């Protein structure tokens, strides 16, 4: 854990604008919930914690909210959240999923994770616009690993981050 935190701090010192813990490249699905909690409990000591983003990587709404609560109790309020995988979802289902999270934890800032190959769902521009309209302070950006949004999604004060190792 200490080496991971040190690595994150080092790349921040070199100019990185933020670090995601438990994203897909960080093998979130292979890290147990207890290991995630251990890591999260070690992050508040970093002087870069305001630039840390916690990827939830969980399909369960309850587990996602509980992990976010632990993060928030450690003064970590930015999250990368993918819609649950496995089942096929419509836009309204995805809006409902994020709405439940934000209703439970309104102090959170969320980056939507658009990665169809992992989740089975691809965000539409319409869905994102609805979420941002409904939650302008909480939905702050999208990581566009499916590359279907970055050219056409134009929302003020909203970040679009197109990148995936699949395309490198």
What are these regions (language model features)?
Residues 38-44, 119, 123-130, 146-153:
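N-terminal active-site wall of soluble small-molecule enzyme domains
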Residues 97, 101, 124-127, 135-138, ...:
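Internal, well-ordered alpha-helical segments in soluble enzyme and binding-protein domains
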Residues 80, 111, 137-146, 158-162:
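Catalytic beta/alpha-barrel core
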Residues 1-120:
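Active-site beta->alpha loop and helix N-cap motifs at the rims of alpha/beta catalytic domains
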Residues 166-168:
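Conserved small/polar residues in nucleotide/adenosyl-binding loops
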Residues 69, 129-133:
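Short, well-structured alpha-helical segments in soluble
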Residues 75, 135, 155-157:
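Short, structured coil segments at secondary-structure junctions
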Residues 59-62, 144-147, 164:
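Short beta->alpha linker loops
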């Amino acid at each position: 854990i200490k080496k991971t935190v040190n690595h994150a701090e080092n790349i921040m010192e070199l100019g990185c604008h933020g670090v995601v813990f438990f994203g897909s490249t960080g093998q979130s699905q292979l890290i147990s919930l207890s290991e995630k909690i251990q890591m999260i409990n070690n992050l508040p000591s970093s002087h870069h914690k305001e630039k840390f983003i916690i990827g939830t990587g969980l399909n369960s709404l309850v587990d996602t909210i509980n992990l976010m609560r632990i993060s928030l109790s450690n003064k970590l309020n930015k999250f990368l959240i993918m819609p649950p995988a496995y089942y096929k979802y419509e836009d309204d289902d995805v809006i409902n999923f994020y709405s439940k999270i934000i209703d439970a934890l309104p102090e959170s800032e969320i980056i939507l994770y658009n990665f169809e190959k992992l989740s089975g769902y691809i965000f539409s521009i319409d869905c994102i616009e609805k979420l941002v309209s409904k939650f302008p302070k909480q939905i702050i950006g999208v990581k566009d690993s499916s590359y279907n949004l970055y050219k056409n999604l134009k929302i003020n004060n909203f970040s679009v981050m197109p990148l995936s190792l699949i395309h490198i």
